[in-house]
């Protein structure tokens, strides 16, 4: 699996992206585990059934991921992984120190980064024949969601107010039989941290690896 994003996305703020990947299961696997993380948040469905949300908030150097047991959600034949990703798209939680606003005692300066919405996902299935893997790559379909207003005010240092237009929702896009042929593919993020974080201070890049995937505790 590789970090992916919508093919035409600029580094905007307050963005929502839909991702889909259809695949075929000949026989139900003995075990199926899906590992997933996103920048900044995700909602996950398998065949229209919601499985979870995440990841946990973290320092960007240690990116948390979630693991879901999805065996009971799979079916013989066509299946789909559907993910809604949300991205702040800009640095958040900046603790700025100025002459008139000194940093409070005991508070450390937090990492501030700009980012593009990204998804990293891998489904691992064990069968009697051989293990099968479905990982995020350029074959995944992606679409910039029009259901949310992106021009909204911040309600604190981290999050924006949410305005959702239900009438704009694409019906059944989380289902396996949805026709996504008109959706574009995804772009693979390459380079520093998958090319997502554009504002990180790289002076400490000698710490290897800079971004470590950590399972949710």
In which residue ranges do the predicted regions lie?
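Extracellular/secretory pathway-exposed regions associated with glycan biology
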Residues: 1-32, 192-217
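Accessory beta-strand-rich segments of carbohydrate-active enzymes
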Residues: 8-10, 14, 19-169
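Activation corresponds to long, low-complexity, non-globular regions
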Residues: 130-217
């Amino acid at each position: 699996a590789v970090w992916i994003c919508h093919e035409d996305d600029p580094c905007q703020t307050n963005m929502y992206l839909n991702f889909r990947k259809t695949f075929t299961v000949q026989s139900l696997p003995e075990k199926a585990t899906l590992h997933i993380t996103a920048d900044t948040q995700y909602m996950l469905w398998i065949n229209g059934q919601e499985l979870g949300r995440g990841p946990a908030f973290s320092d960007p150097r240690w990116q948390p991921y979630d693991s879901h047991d999805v065996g009971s959600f799979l079916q013989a034949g066509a299946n789909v992984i559907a993910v809604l990703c949300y991205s702040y798209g800009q640095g958040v939680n900046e603790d700025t120190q100025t002459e008139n606003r000194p940093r409070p005692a005991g508070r450390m300066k937090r990492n501030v980064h700009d980012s593009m919405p990204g998804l990293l996902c891998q489904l691992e299935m064990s069968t009697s024949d051989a293990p099968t893997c479905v990982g995020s790559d350029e074959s995944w379909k992606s679409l910039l969601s029009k259901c949310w207003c992106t021009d909204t005010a911040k309600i604190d240092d981290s999050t924006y107010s949410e305005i959702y237009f239900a009438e704009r929702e694409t019906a059944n896009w989380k289902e396996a039989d949805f026709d996504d042929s008109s959706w574009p593919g995804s772009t693979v993020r390459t380079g520093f941290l998958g090319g997502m974080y554009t504002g990180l201070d790289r002076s400490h890049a000698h710490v290897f690896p800079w971004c470590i995937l950590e399972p949710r505790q």
